[in-house]
Amino acid sequence: RCNLACKYCVGNWSARKINDFTMDELKKVIDECKGLGTVHFTIHGGEILLRNDTKEIIDYLKGNGMYVNLVTNGILLPEKIDDVVDVDSLCISLDGREENNDYNRGKGTYKAVMAAIKIAREKKLKFVVHATLTKRSIEDVEYLCEQAKEMNYYQQFSLLLKPLTARQEDQDLGLTDEEARDTMRKLIELKDKGYPIFTFYPTLRNVINWPFNLSKSRLNRDEIPANADLINCYYGKLKISIDADGFAYPCSSLNDSFDALNVKEVGVRRAFDHIIKTNNCEACYYLTQNDWSLLLGGSMNQFINQAYIQAKGVFKRS
């Protein structure tokens, strides 16, 4: 479920009518994940803060020794802040200046998210701010990075190449191939100037050097050119995505195409084994996924990069 209706939403969460996990079902999934060696758990949506048991979920995850990252649109964060103070990290969504953010995400969301950022800072929580880059928000990239520098947090980005809704009026939101690659070059320039951009250099270069038009966002094993220098994907090998309806995917970008099993029906282990055996997706240019794949693949530079970011967050809270 979600309390917003962002124009580019991949899940159409605000219109979904599925039954979410019960607390008992979630605890069973968490127990199974722990048994498989899980140490990091990201809670995302939809909007998790619509639930009344978010604190109980976080407490159960922390009690099982897991690092907990929570993704929120920020609207309910000020009133639910006491429920999330024990997470290890937060991700709050903001797409740009008020006009462009509210065009993408709904009227009034900019002011609400700025209030969420304010209270996260007051509580000394470790958080990043995430922006989806659309035709409207690419003009605000420097603004977002400047604000992150002033307010002492990291700015994260993802790319929208085409709208993921059927609404005809939203079809102009996606970036062209040229706009996307040029924006990655701009982010590299800003990182070089010291702006706190979470997205890692190799991830940004991976978009610039993508061997196909960016309308082709994912590659199966037999589609990767022999001389291509792409980031190896570890989604579906060391990391999976479980939807609110229980279906388990290699990653959320495949929820419209992968033949998934449901953890409520077959359990996490069998659903994970099915992913390992049948997933054929090997590379993409998605920013968050490739930042993760560098870490999971043992990139020493990414380990150092993340250790620095995590250490800054620890000192912020102390």
Label the model's feature ranges.
Residues 5, 37-38, 86, 151-154, ...:
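Short loop/turn motifs at secondary-structure junctions
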Residues 78, 99-100:
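A short, histidine- and acid-enriched strand-loop-helix "catalytic/donor-clamping" loop
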Residues 1-83, 306, 318:
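Conserved alpha-helical substructure of the radical SAM core
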Residues 13, 45, 94, 159, ...:
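Residues that line or immediately flank small-molecule/substrate-binding pockets and catalytic motifs
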Residues 1-13, 17, 31-35, 204-228, ...:
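N-terminal pre-core extensions flanking Radical SAM catalytic domains
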Residues 227-234, 245-318:
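Flexible mid-to-C-terminal extensions adjoining Fe-S/redox cofactors in radical SAM and related proteins
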Residues 21, 64-67, 88-89, 93-95, ...:
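Radical SAM enzyme [4Fe-4S]-AdoMet core and its adjacent flexible, acidic
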